[in-house]
Amino acid sequence: MPESLIAGIPVHFPFEPYPVQRAYMEKVIQCLRDGTNGVLESPTGTGKTLSLLCSSLAWIRTRQSEHQQQMVKMEKADFTGLGGGAAGGDLSELAKTMGRANNWGVPKVIYASRTHSQLTQAMRELKRTAYANMRSVVLGSRDQLCIHPEVMREQGNSNKTNMCKLRVHSKTCSFQMRVESRKDHPDLRGPSIMDIEDLVKVGQRLKICPYFASRELVPQADITFMPYNYLLDPKARKANKIELGNTIVILDEAHNIEKICEESASVQIKSSDVAMAIEDVTHIMQVFASGESQDMGGDEPKDFTLDDLTLLKEMLLEFEKAIDAVVVENAVEGTTFPASMMYELLGKANFTYGNVATIVSLLDKLVQYLLVASQQMTIRKGGTFTMLSDLLTIVFANKEDVMSKVYASFKVHVQLEEVKQGHGKQQGGKQHGGWLGKGTIAAATGSIKVAKIINFWCFNPGFGMEQLLNTQVRSVILTSGTLAPLKPLIAELAIPVAQHLENPHIVDQSQVYVKIIGTGPDRQQLISNYANRDNPKYISSLGQTILNVSRIVPDGLLVFFPSYPMLNKCVDAWQASGLWADISVKKPIFLEPRSKDQFTSTMEEFYQAIRDSKGAVFMAVCRGKVSEGLDFADRNGRAVIITGLPFPPLKDPKVILKRRYLEANRTRENQLLSGQEWYNLDATRAVNQAIGRVIRHRNDYGAILLCDSRFKDASQVQQLSKWIRGHLGDRPQCSPFGPIVRELRQFFKNAEANMKLPDERETDSPLETVCKTENEPIAAIPKVKREPGSNATFKSANESAIKVEMANSIKTWTPADYASAAGRKLGGAAPNAMDFMSRLDSNVSSIDFNCCMDSKSGSSGMVKIHKRERSSPTQPESSSQVSKKRYKLVENIKVEPSSSQVKEAPAERADFLRELRSLVTQDQFRRFGKALLEYKDGTYESFQALMVILLDVLSAPKVRYMLVGMRKYLKNEHKDEFDQKVGKL
């Protein structure tokens, strides 16, 4: 492939890069070289993904080459005199070998996007480049990767996750057990790039679990592909063992990144969920009391006791009572409270930072217990326990020392929910020992009509981004086709950005026709605001506009509405008036369905209809599946009509609170948007994304028709993507409908005559990335003339198998996805990577029963029991008796750190080595140097050899602080074992 020198780095690109691609790659390389962050916009169709992959991996490959040269030089270095002053040069080289803190070796790339279909497209792009032989891996969910037949039969992601955990824990999954012995198989470690489907095929062939096998590939991968939720949520990162130190994080399709950051930190719980959780606990207690637990859960002792259940039920009853006491003043819109109210509610039930890890662990064990029991009898599978676990995990995710930020960034909103009669009815209608709570009894008898919904909402996306930056990543690059305007985005995310870019489109001005249509054929104003959207004249005029445009636009026509209600309202009116039938005569009409199954079949029918000479119309909704993830290149989308601005619901509580948050926190320094500016921008970004479905590559062409007179307002125009603004001019105006019809007809006549046909452009499917990587420049392909009105038959990509089953297949993430992590440590809030060492230098507290150890230690916070240890069901049970009997609270006793703990190792490499040489003998220092050189490749064997030397040389109390200081020079995958070995000293 041709090589281009970009920002001093040789980049192999499939063809001579266009100016916009070169500018984009320069910005990427500058970010990686300087260790800074970037926000880069490049319109869809400009080869953004290809440019991103080639530039980042070219820089990685260059760094790898430099690193190898340095290692060769180090191998030739003379370390015989390391103990003396004459070896200053060699000492300097050894310091370079050690690298910076958390910076051993070459950085790695993490490429994240919204959906797995987008990740698959990116991996297909990578396969066509000169970097296809670089090591890569994709991380997916159990729902996508599991091949165990019984787990696959489970309904819902949460049930599959819990069933998988159960089988792994009980060692009854043969696929997972084979991973260790076959993880180095050539089919798994080979040079070929494997997407989700490829991983599943390899797993089936080797009879190993693709989910766990993919995790084994991560440490050696140069680039790892994963969905956003694996990356942005700190708990998900911990569960998937994702190390971010010295990594390059690329967030593609980042136009919704603020919302994703907010939603990953938000959670909801219903009082009806709490009531059902109480029922489930009560049922398990009844089973224990009757001695039937062996029948339900097998012969193994349970990981919880009857006393554990008693205490949990007391806490849930108190939580239910606290929720019942909340006064909702506005029954329609709900009532808003400060974030502290959530901690007060949970505190009344004794859910605290001190015991939340223990409670979450117990809830997870109960879910697994019910999963086993559900195989033998009809019983709920613990979904309410999962919801409670999600709530506690998210609410207590942040450490207590950042609570001021939490209070500023979150709000609690309480709404009322109608409850069905008899919902949550107790099985068998029995009350056991007076343990049915008031809410449970009321729900069972139908005496209450409403339940409360407790929402814990985050409104500060910068809160999550700050946590990401604190992991010591090298660079974060946010990129998309529709990020503009950039300043508000950067301000909300609150990250330092050194590089930013708004690229023009790669297509020529003559290939795009953009107009604002302010009136329909009958001169009725087109404006889809609240006051006009029910106007029959407006709806009729909009339908006539679409009818006239459908007569002119060849092939595919996309029509986007602000919302589903507006789409349905127009469809009903047009069907009643006959306009629907008139449009259908010109082109068959397809409507965007909401269900995944219907969506797949509808897309297949639409692509099939495009083959017909009439084409087809697809009516969809902004922010829907079609507007966010699909490619309508060439004939699939020759024009897009935007019927209105998709503003968020003005009276929605979340929208109201977001606007209030911005107004309350806006300053001149942080440059946050006002509430109204954010409201307008949210609508325009959805429009930009919908527009991006057409004009998908260098030789594509199409029309963009903005059918709402408000698009002429300067405030709206400035929020459109830069390349669209260029077509509207400095002072855009609404054009009369008649001239637009004539211009549009002439535009398509010229385009069909001068642009090359879609069948000449090689594609795999309409859903794949369209920026292909031909070996020759696209511009070199000769243009083919098509006679106007020709009914030529196209042998296009549509005639190949149309793969729509993965289109925009967004997997909804829940905290249950990370709750199953193997080797999980259930402390309070998840500590960061340096917490182990930083705690050696701080005050130490004694351990109480709330402290959870790793289950392997045999000293968990929850005590395993046998049946003989159960409390007697006939014994009077009170909360005080139970607590005294099973749980003993221990006061935290502070221990002052020793002098060796207080002292810290020098931060600079050269200073570190000089001090070490002054503390140890010449022979010890020589052994240390040799072991460090042998560790250059970072293999596990070389790590073990290095640890032997470190523990021998640096375990003495007076030099142990130097041992602690060595941690930052180790590879990330070796740090946990290092911590364990040092912790035993």
Swiss-Prot record:
Highest taxon, organism lineage: Eukaryota
Residues at which ATP binds: S42, P43, T44, G45, T46, G47, K48, T49
Motif position, DEAH box: 252-255
Database matches in InterPro entries: ATP-dep_Helicase_C, DinG/Rad3-like, Helic_SF1/SF2_ATP-bd_DinG/Rad3, Helicase-like_DEXD_c2, P-loop_NTPase, RAD3-like_helicase_DEAD, Rad3/Chl1-like, RTEL1
Bias-annotated ranges (Polar residues): 872-882
UniProt-listed Enzyme Commission number(s): 5.6.2.-
Domain (Helicase ATP-binding) ranges: 7-303
CDD domains, A to Z: DEAHc_FancJ (cd17970), SF2_C_XPD (cd18788)
Amino-acid positions noted as binding [4Fe-4S] cluster in the UniProt annotation, renumbered to this chain: C146, C164, C173, C209
Reaction catalysed by this enzyme: ATP + H2O = ADP + phosphate + H(+)
GO MF, one annotated term: ATP binding
GO BP: any one term: negative regulation of t-circle formation
PANTHER family: DNA REPAIR DEAD HELICASE RAD3/XP-D SUBFAMILY MEMBER (PTHR11472), REGULATOR OF TELOMERE ELONGATION HELICASE 1 (PTHR11472:SF34)
Homology family: Belongs to the helicase family. RAD3/XPD subfamily.
Function: A probable ATP-dependent DNA helicase implicated in DNA repair and the maintenance of genomic stability. Acts as an anti-recombinase to counteract toxic recombination and limit crossover during meiosis. Regulates meiotic recombination and crossover homeostasis by physically dissociating strand invasion events and thereby promotes noncrossover repair by meiotic synthesis dependent strand annealing (SDSA) as well as disassembly of D loop recombination intermediates.
Official protein name in the record: Regulator of telomere elongation helicase 1 homolog
Highest classification ranks of the organism: Eukaryota, Metazoa, Ecdysozoa, Arthropoda, Hexapoda
